[in-house]
């Protein structure tokens, strides 16, 4: 049996961190308010980070903080101050791409482990060994590596140097995520946390001798999403991932909702545990894993580079829209006197049938019986996003349960290929 892997889940906020922890993460990675390459994510204040780390550690879950900016000179003083603050709240590791930032981390907080981000283009065992000699304890493999290449890596690096690999989520069209399109089109630097995702826009080809004549690609007169990748999904290949010697299975998505994080964490948790317990049970349950994971809000799936270089089926040429099966309504907070406190995320009404998604076990269909606002006034619906409400359901819910509503599918979902 292969080694027991870590399940590493993203979190965009304190609420999502707690969701990841409760729904099965072994470790969570988060970003602060600077230097983490997710300027549009909610990110964590130092106070939220401190609370999140304490919550995770109380549940025996680790927390890694991203500092994977490709720094300019002007960034370095702020990086130093940031690491001085992080030293006090004791995350389990820093995720770093820039050698200059790495050196500052070694100097300021040597007791915190240093992981090398995929942004550093980690494609060969020479690179892994270099970072090991510098003091890194883990390297995140480039998304461009195949399983065979990862096996070769494992055989040529120290046993105590960990390999972390993205196994699920969005794929960047650029090499190891180092995109220049956003900076070129909008002046917002993807390598400094401000990507505008131009890979999801439509494009047409122009031949230099025919200015003004826009040539459609794949016969789409409005252009094509030629840079628009499907999402990575490797849940049906857990055995292959573990046999390759991967230590940490990483889920992409530091800008995703709590519903997405709960669904992916719970499903991958069960898949890993099933395989470790009984490989035959895992094989039997693969259709269930795929059904559950496809209920999130995301695109069609691909296996990326794991089994060789992707072909044209990896791209989505006609759309950048998301497949959607469930609408996220909120997370159950305190439960008292039969009322669930929630901060509502999407509209729902009295009399509707919704689902309670639990960390363990089956989902439960319930009726919304009553809705009260913070003043105790009864209302028929929850129309305002982020309104704090107290909701009576036809069956009991527990703190950290997810409330969601099933929607009619607009299209047939494509599962892993």
Predicted regions and their residues:
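Gly/Gly-Pro- and Ser/Thr-rich, intrinsically disordered tail segments characteristic of DNA damage-repair
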Residues: 77, 112-123
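Alpha-helix capping/helix-boundary segments
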Residues: 100-101
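Surface-exposed amphipathic alpha-helical tracts and adjacent flexible/coil segments at the periphery
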Residues: 1-11, 16-22, 27-30, 34, ...
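Conserved phosphotransfer cores of two-component systems
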Residues: 109
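Glycine-rich, positively charged N-terminal anion/phosphate-binding segment
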Residues: 38-55
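Short beta-strand elements of ligand-binding domains
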Residues: 65-66, 96, 116-118
